[in-house]
Amino acid sequence: MDDMMRAMDCLNMAATLRNAALASATCTGRTLGEDREPIWVEGSRKTPEPPLPEESPAPEPNNEIPLLPKIDFEPNISCFPDLQAINASIVRRELEEEGKRCVRQQLKAIRDKQDAMRLSRETQQRKEERQRDQLQQKALRERNESLLIQKADQMTAAQLEAQQREQLALRQQIDQKLHKLALEGVSRCQRRFNQKYEGIAKILLSLNPETVKVCAAQNTQLKELGQKFEQLVSSVKMGNCEMQSQFLCSIIKAEEFCKSLDALELDIIKQLAEFSEQIQQQLKMEAAKKLEDERQRQQQQEEERQKLEEQQKLEEQEKLRKEKEESAAKEKQQEAETAKADAANVPAPLEPKSQDVPPAATATSTSVHPDRLKFYNDILALYQSKVDAVKPLQTEESLKQYRTGCQRAINLPLNAISAVSPQHLAQNFDKLYSFFAGQPTKVMNGTITINDHPLARDYCMLLMAKKFVSQTETAICSNPQAAFPFASVIITFWKLLPDFGKVFLAYMYKESPFLVPYVIPQQQGQTPEQYLKTIGYRLTDKNELEKPDIYLKRQTGLARLYAAVIISQGRKAAGPDECFELNEGWLWLAHMVHVKPLPDISATLIMEILQTLGFELWRTYGKQFVKLLVYIQNIYMPQLAAYDEGGPKTRLEMLLAKFLRERQIAQAVGVLPPGFW
């Protein structure tokens, strides 16, 4: 029974029933509950009725087997059943049915669970079998694929080897054809190259040694091209080309060498043409110089002849004067004797005193001093010779980019000149001077040097001088102190490049001939507009003459720069020699007050020169300069008043009065101290 109960506890119905069958064969009495007397014995004893058994609670939904209620009596078929027994029997049967039903439910649940577990095991087994089959099929498939791949690799390797053999044979055929074509192409280029090379060599051999030196660079380049072409031909003949493209490259290189040789021939011809033109220019310049020397010699002879004639005339006049004096003395002596004899009391008439008559001023003496005129002509002649010399460079269209590079190399550092610091001024000067010294200079399109063209030095000198003069219209007009750093750089270049100073003066004199000083006279038949152009007036965009105030402003800037150049010192490293000293300012003032005054411009320029140079002139010349100021105030100003009654003349009068009253002139603002840079 214990085994049956354990089996019941384990919900193993089959084992429970089997154990119950075994127990029922050996069971002879009651197997559950306490030992009691039979019900009929208890009934005879009239024992009280046992209480009805309590109904057992309904089974829990957790499928537990309900326990049968305890019955105190045991039915017997021999006894007459009573109501209590019947009820107990009914209850027992119901409980039994309920227990059976619960057992059936539990058995069904167990069977369902077992079926589910069996199905799960079968499903898992089928799945495992299917996976094993799949793995076996996959392994088989992989083996088959590996076999196929091996076979395919073997076939592919064989095909590839065959294709490689075919390609190698085909490539060898193509290489042979390309080699043959390259030989033919290079041979054609070689014939062209040799013909051109021999022609250039004949040209160079026909030149004299001096001309060959001009083409030395081209000669070296010709030799290099010949060597490179020979190397290319030998390389093609030997077939030293690993790639097919190299055969084509060899033909292209041969063509490039031929083109380079053509360009070299053109360069040599151009260089020879330029050299020939330069020789012609030199011959022309020498001829012009000879003509100029001859003209000057004739002019000197003419001047000497005129001086000799004037001297002879003066001697004749002196001789006539002496003869007249002697005859007059004799007449006086005779008259005196007659007077003494005839009229002793009559006094002799007084002889009138002769007055000194100044010599008549010629047109030249009222316009310019002869020495200054000669200096002016020499400066312009030098300027014109340089302008004529650089025309080939200036007009050649192929050199436009080079001219632009030269302009950038000059304009950028020149526009940056200022007295911000000595280092800044020296840095911009060094950029300009290094370019003139032949150092490579970076520009927008690369690097250039002044030695790239034989005429570049004169061209750049003219360009820089013109750029310095143009600063009078921009920087110096708006800022008078800016004239002094520009003047210091100009003086330094003047010391290092003497021709630059003369070219600079030529541009200054072209813009303002009054700086000579030269008051150009109006020619007969010349219109007022034409005359104003000759003294520096410009035409506006509307083809009209500029206004007088604009003209005076520009002339003031020119005079300020001119005066600043006179008193400025150059860089210490450039040397102590002065090339445009203070006596130039003294000469200008002395000559300016002896030429014909012009309205506005004469007073404006004198006032600007005095304000800029007055301090240095007073300190250097002292009383002589004071006498010059007094002469300007007392002699020149009345002459100027006959032509000018405008504002510049009034301001000059006030300035002279202030200088003479205070007995000093303040130093110009912005003058660089000695040794500034």
From Swiss-Prot:
Main location (coarse class): cytoplasm
GO CC list: cytoplasm; nuclear pore; nuclear pore cytoplasmic filaments
Localization: Cytoplasm; Nucleus, Nuclear pore complex
Transmembrane domains' residue ranges: none
An individual GO BP term: protein transport
Molecular function GO terms recorded: inositol hexakisphosphate binding; phospholipid binding; translation initiation factor binding
Compositional bias ranges of the Pro residues kind: 49-60
Keyword Hydrolase: no
Subunit structure: May associate with the NPC.
Job of this protein: Required for the export of mRNAs containing poly(A) tails from the nucleus into the cytoplasm. May be involved in the terminal step of the mRNA transport through the nuclear pore complex (NPC).
PANTHER family in alphabetical order: GLE-1-RELATED, MRNA EXPORT FACTOR GLE1
Name of the protein described by the UniProt record: mRNA export factor Gle1
